[in-house]
Structure formats: structure tokens, C-alpha cells
Amino acid sequence: MAAVTTDLIRELRERTSAGMMDCKKALEENNADIEKAITWLREKGIAKAAKKAGRETKEGRIVSYIHGNGKIGVLLELNSETDFVSKNEEFEALGKEICMQIAAMNPLYLNEESIPAADLEREKGIMKSQLEAEGKKAEQIEKILPGKIKKYVSEVCLVNQAFFKDDSKTIDDLVKEAIAKFGENITIAHFVRFQVGGL
């Protein structure tokens, strides 16, 4: 078993912002392999986030972002349980990251539940017609369609989108990491994206 050194703990702490003891435990659990320790911490954070997901988020802030060319702007309501967290610089930085995601990736909906049923059915119909035009049989279509719908959701729903700075995680993962870090529930309530000449 490889030795867990203070340098390894420090590096893991710098890369993850996790607590010193959490970093030490992660390295011990993963034979001092820093990449595996990062994954372990992320999984642990997501588990922590799941426990906090039911809590009410009555505090928060409106975060804004105007893209450098002045032609795209975003307003985001990001909520937390306490004003202590919502006034934190890292909370605001999270809001800015999410705003930049919205500006860059132009999601249409917050999450899958917010897609109107009629819109989802229309998309399913289009996908089905495309598959039929490709000569796919009904049983093939039934197997292919769920994957195509999942891909569509990952493109149009903010929380399902791959994070533009690190496509190994989604916006939902980013929020769960923040929940684990701050120790309280954080939710994205609303967002609006404006574009000059857009509808």
C-alpha cells in the first residue's frame, strides 16, 4: 500500500476544496491514487447532496452575466438554505459559472420535468419519423427511441447538460458538488437568457 503523504493530501485538497480529513481518508481508501481519490470524494459529495436535497431553499440571489460582446445576457435565481451561503463569494462564482453555461449552451428548460408534455411528444414524433425514414423496424425504433430522448434531454435541459468547462460532469453534478461543499441544499429556481435579435 502506497504511503499517504502530506504533499498528496495538500494536492488533493487544492484540486477538490475538500476538507483535510476527507482528503486523507479518500487517499487511504484508494491506495494513495489521487485520481481515484477525486472520484471517491465526488461520489461521497453526491451522496451528501442527496441527503440535503429535500431541504427548503428560501435564501439566494439573482446572478447576472453579460457576454463580452454585449449581445447575450442571462439572469439566474440560485437559491440556498441560508443567507450566509448565498452571500459567499464561491456561491456567487457558482452562479456565474451556471450563467455562462446558459449563455453558451442556450438550454430551453431547467430540467426534464419542466419540458411541456406536448413538446416532448412532438420531439418523440419527429425522432420516430426520422427512424422510420431510415428504414428502421418498429421493434428497432422502440429500442433506439429512449436513447435519442435521453440525448435530446441532455441538450435542452440545463441540469442535464454537460458542463462547458468539464464535460465529464453535468450542471446537476456541479450543483451537487456545491451542496457537499457548503453543507446545505442549493437549487436553481429560474433562468432567463436574452439575445439581441432573439425572440
Swiss-Prot record:
Pfam families in the cross-refs: EF_TS
UniProt keyword NAD present: no
Matches recorded under InterPro entries: EF-Ts_dimer_sf, Transl_elong_EFTs/EF1B, Transl_elong_EFTs/EF1B_dimer, Transl_elong_Ts_CS, UBA-like_sf
Database matches in Gene3D superfamilies: 1.10.286.20, DNA helicase RuvA subunit, C-terminal domain, Elongation factor Ts, dimerisation domain
A cellular-component GO term for this protein: cytoplasm
Major subcellular location class: cytoplasm
Positions of region (Involved in Mg(2+) ion dislocation from EF-Tu): 82-85
Keywords: Cytoplasm, Elongation factor, Protein biosynthesis
Protein biosynthesis keyword on record: yes
Domain of life, per lineage: Bacteria
Function: Associates with the EF-Tu.GDP complex and induces the exchange of GDP to GTP. It remains bound to the aminoacyl-tRNA.EF-Tu.GTP complex up to the GTP hydrolysis stage on the ribosome.
Listed HAMAP family: EF_Ts (MF_00050)
Similarity comment: Belongs to the EF-Ts family.
Protein name per UniProt: Elongation factor Ts
Organism: Leptospira borgpetersenii serovar Hardjo-bovis (strain JB197)
